[in-house]
Amino acid sequence: RQWILLGVVLSLLACLAVAGTTAVVTKHYMLLSAVVLVGGLLPMFFVFEYRRPQAREIVTLAIMTALCVGVNELCSHTIPLHAGTAFVILTGTCLGPEAGFMVGALSRLLCNFFDGQGPWTPWQMLTWGLLGICFGVIYSRGKRFHNPVRFVIGLAVMAFITVFVVYGGIMNFAAWLMDHAMSPLNSALTKEELLMVYAAGVPYDLTHAGTTALCILLFGHTVIEKLQRIQIKYGI
């Protein structure tokens, strides 16, 4: 089922590429945000609902979503750590790709009720959801590890790379589109502008990836232990 899910994700990314090309040609850049929301998010919610999850799993995901939103808002208004992203990654690692996507997408939607909703919301939901899927597929529901320290360090390194590439890559592209959509000049998109956006986003992306990895190093092992205990106790 995980390979089928990965195939669905790759198909969605292909559809997004086609939609992006169409948006660039027609200069309807905000159309792509709607395509992301409808074509990239709804199918994943349908996949989750189709398999009829048990109440114990839904409660666990609701708790992880609440924790993710809580720590993300706490850090965003106090210390500059991206603990919310770390919680999404840990959820996908322990509970699988579907759970990782649900927690990631729903958490980002709820976070933006505090931080501000806008055309960037579906993009952020998609990127957090994709992070949950990626780590759910890579680590296959947090299989038992013999060396916890080595596992958490490896997870932190993988988180740094994935957050920088996936989150940074998608959100910088989204910023490029939204900037042009809101510009009164209605100018055409250029490759040079995209490269400038990516270059300008490198410091933030490095900070985001680095603080996410730091959060995993700080409390990743504890969260993984608790989630695996819940899996064993309740058969999730």
Predicted feature locations:
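Membrane-embedded alpha-helical hairpins and interfacial helices in multi-pass inner-membrane proteins
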Residues: 1-37, 77, 82, 117-123, ...
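Hydrophobic alpha-helical transmembrane segments
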Residues: 17-24, 45-50, 71-74, 112-116
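Helix-loop-helix hairpins and the membrane-proximal interhelical loops
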Residues: 36-58, 62, 66
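Alpha-helical transmembrane segments in multipass membrane proteins, preferentially the mid-helix core
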Residues: 43-47, 132-144
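Transmembrane alpha-helical segments of multi-pass membrane proteins
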Residues: 57-72, 156-165
